[in-house]
């Protein structure tokens, strides 16, 4: 039992080294070919592709809404359980491992990779949409009422709070533990080693990693495309700049160029630096909105949002007997499928930067800290938007007309609107750069067979691919092409839900083995156990 996780497989042993690259055979080759075929097909038949993928996405959501909701609840409970159990003392990388990044830089990278851009896009638009019945109201509450306002904030927190971060935490902890503590490659397949042992390095593992690569690059490319549209829309709204395809392509070129520079510089010189800049700029904007908006009333807004979140988290996470099917299928199940499809990317990136933390520290940081930050952010921005709607102030008073402009419409009614809106555009772009460069590092690691130090040309290849895909889809197929690829990424959420549930079982098996046979709480040396506990 002590040698249960020993394997003769060596990281990179299946790799092909040519053209300055270090490519896993066959994951790199198959992923590249399939991505190319999907993009070409979508460019040639954008409307047909969108219709087909929308159909598969709709089928997944309509028939398996219960599975997404149940799985989301399981992930949250599983993470909370790990905080309480003795396995929480296990340190990622072994008892002597030290964190590679300061707490502040670590938090900044977690947040920027996880959902920073989403908070810019939806922090005003989503509560406003729920309050005005743009696409259903949570739990069927009457729109444009005080109760509807409270529930709009609570439901928004539900979609951006514990559940999505629990999804990321399961993947991230599984990858980090099996890589740093068991010596397995840092790829999705390694999480299944407890079940299938060395078969993980065969075609079963190849398929899992290929799907993870495709979900990641499709998700990143579509987000980059939609982000370019939002940034272009913001520039047009503020400065009258044409928001057409030329502006959008220029934004993509700029974002991709900076992302390439960042991935060349690596985690320390690129991703960490941009994430710290992100956190600083976001904090400035947040403090401004609080100061000129709610002021000291922000504490009431936070209590209002937190209270609604706590009161409604169970009803919102349950599908039985609900009459708001339009809402929970259109919003909640969609979000859960999207978070799950993004989990290979975000989870692997979090694993990359989390060595040296204990399991307990890891779960608290990944699950609770972002939830608290999101609570403050949503209370400030979402609360300000709803307050303007209730007071009949500005364009938001007429409801949500253009989701991408809701943030700018809210800022337009505050002092120094031009400056703060310009800062918001910069934040949108920098958040996209951090998503692109961290995503490129993740895809690079998977397609290099789990290597953390793949050659620079390989990093450049994937960062360039993301920009080319986004630009080509915008230029050739517009919103239909982007929507098709987004629907394809979300469709991956259904099979990956089962993958994540299996990960929970495998992770617990691995942690239990580590506690008993490696840390010595069963038969091994007591000193390591004491060291682990004292350092937790």
State what each model feature region is.
Residues 1-146, 264, 287, 504-511, ...:
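N-terminal alpha-helical transmembrane segments of multi-pass membrane transport
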Residues 8-18, 51-57, 85-103, 128-154, ...:
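Flexible loop linkers connecting adjacent transmembrane helices
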Residues 15-20, 45-60, 79-100, 152-159, ...:
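Membrane-water interface regions at transmembrane-helix termini and the short interhelical loops
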Residues 34, 67-84, 282-293, 373-383, ...:
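Hydrophobic alpha-helical segments of multi-pass membrane transport proteins
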């Amino acid at each position: 039992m002590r040698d249960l996780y020993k394997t003769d497989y060596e990281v990179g042993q299946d790799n092909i080294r040519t053209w300055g690259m270090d490519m896993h055979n066959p994951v790199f080759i198959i992923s590249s070919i399939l991505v190319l075929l999907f993009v070409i097909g979508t460019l040639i038949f954008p409307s047909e592709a969108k219709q087909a993928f929308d159909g598969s996405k709709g089928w997944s959501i309509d028939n398996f809404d219960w599975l997404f909701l149940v799985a989301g609840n399981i992930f949250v409970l599983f993470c909370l359980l790990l905080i309480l159990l003795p396995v929480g003392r296990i340190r990622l990388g072994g008892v002597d491992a030290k964190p590679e990044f300061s707490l502040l830089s670590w938090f900044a990278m977690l947040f920027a990779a996880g959902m920073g851009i989403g908070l810019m896009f939806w922090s005003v638009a989503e509560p406003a949409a729920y309050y005005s019945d743009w696409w259903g109201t949570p739990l069927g509450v009457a729109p444009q009422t005080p109760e509807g306002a409270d529930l709009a904030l609570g439901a928004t927190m539900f979609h951006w709070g514990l559940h999505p971060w629990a999804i990321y935490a399961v993947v991230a902890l599984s990858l980090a533990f099996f890589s740093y503590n068991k010596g397995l490659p840092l790829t999705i397949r390694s999480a299944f080693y407890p079940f299938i042992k060395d078969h993980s390095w065969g075609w079963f593992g190849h398929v899992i990693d290929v799907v993870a690569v495709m979900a990641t690059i499709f998700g990143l490319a579509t987000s980059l495309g939609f982000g370019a549209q939002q940034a272009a829309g913001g520039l047009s709204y503020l400065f009258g700049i044409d928001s057409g395809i030329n502006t959008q392509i220029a934004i993509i070129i700029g974002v991709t160029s900076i992302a390439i520079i960042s991935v060349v510089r690596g985690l320390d010189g690129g991703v960490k630096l941009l994430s710290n800049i992100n956190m600083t700029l976001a904090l400035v904007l947040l403090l401004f909105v609080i100061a000129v908006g709610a002021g000291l009333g922000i504490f009431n807004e936070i209590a209002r949002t937190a209270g609604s979140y706590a009161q409604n988290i169970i009803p919102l996470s349950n599908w039985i007997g609900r009459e708001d099917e339009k809402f929970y299928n259109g919003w909640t199940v969609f979000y859960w499928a999207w978070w799950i499809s993004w989990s290979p990317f975000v989870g692997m990136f979090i694993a990359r930067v989390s060595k040296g933390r204990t399991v307990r520290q890891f779960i608290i940081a990944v699950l609770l800290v972002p939830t608290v930050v999101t609570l403050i952010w949503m209370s400030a921005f979402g609360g300000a938007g709803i307050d303007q709607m209730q007071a009949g102030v500005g364009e938001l008073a007429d409801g949500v007309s253009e989701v991408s402009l809701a943030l700018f419409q809210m800022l337009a009614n505050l002092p120094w609107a031009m400056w703060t809106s310009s800062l918001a555009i910069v934040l949108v772009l920098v958040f996209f750069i951090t998503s692109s460069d961290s995503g490129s590092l993740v895809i690079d690691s998977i397609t290099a067979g789990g290597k953390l130090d793949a050659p620079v040309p390989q990093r450049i290849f994937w960062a360039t691919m993301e920009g080319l895909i986004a630009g080509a889809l915008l230029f050739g197929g517009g919103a239909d092409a982007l929507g098709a690829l987004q629907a394809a990424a979300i469709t991956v959420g259904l099979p990956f839900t089962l993958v994540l549930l299996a990960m929970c079982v495998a992770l617990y098996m691995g942690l239990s083995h580590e506690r008993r046979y490696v840390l010595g709480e069963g038969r091994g040396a007591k000193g390591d156990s004491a060291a682990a506990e004292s350092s937790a």
